[in-house]
């Protein structure tokens, strides 16, 4: 199994921590005035999203995780599994709710996603940065009702709820940023 020395560690690298795949979020090299230099590594476990920090000596190493990021198309959900297909090999995989990582609320069908596979099993799904979804339910915007910040909740066709401006009405299509879960624009 491959491993990384502390000089090779960079943000975004996939590592193995207690037999769990993780991605490095932040690294900080510290050289105190007295004593040996060390590196602080902050990482996020891919499966459950927990963030942890560890301090390592310059002679330590981290094991590389054998994970693969693959572009796949979302096909459908049967309630228990979300089904994805590789557009080149037509290979299909099924992701559980835990493997979806909250991405299920942005997918309605045919979206291109980045699926992280570990031992051939999907452990994390990253939806596209922006999706266009139809508003199925929202209150009508009343003119002059801006004391609460000028926004209102809207339920989308996938069941997700986002805050939208008062001028957006029901049955309109909006663009949503999936990274922050916020309204981005109205689609014509």
UniProtKB/Swiss-Prot annotation:
PTM field: May be beta-lysylated on the epsilon-amino group of Lys-34 by the combined action of EpmA and EpmB, and then hydroxylated on the C5 position of the same residue by EpmC (if this protein is present). Lysylation is critical for the stimulatory effect of EF-P on peptide-bond formation. The lysylation moiety may extend toward the peptidyltransferase center and stabilize the terminal 3-CCA end of the tRNA. Hydroxylation of the C5 position on Lys-34 may allow additional potential stabilizing hydrogen-bond interactions with the P-tRNA.
Keywords of the record: Cytoplasm, Elongation factor, Hydroxylation, Protein biosynthesis
Modified residues (N6-(3,6-diaminohexanoyl)-5-hydroxylysine): 34
Gene Ontology process terms (BP): peptide biosynthetic process
InterPro entries: Elong-fact-P_C, NA-bd_OB-fold, Rib_uL2_dom2, Transl_elong_fac_P/YeiP, Transl_elong_KOW-like, Transl_elong_P/YeiP_cen, Transl_elong_P/YeiP_CS, Transl_elongation_fac_P
Cell location: Cytoplasm
Family matches, as SUPFAM superfamilies: Nucleic acid-binding proteins, Translation proteins SH3-like domain
Described function: Involved in peptide bond synthesis. Alleviates ribosome stalling that occurs when 3 or more consecutive Pro residues or the sequence PPG is present in a protein, possibly by augmenting the peptidyl transferase activity of the ribosome. Modification of Lys-34 is required for alleviation.
Name under which the protein is recorded: Elongation factor P
Gene source species: Stenotrophomonas maltophilia (strain K279a)
Lineage: Bacteria, Pseudomonadati, Pseudomonadota, Gammaproteobacteria, Lysobacterales
Gene name per UniProt: efp
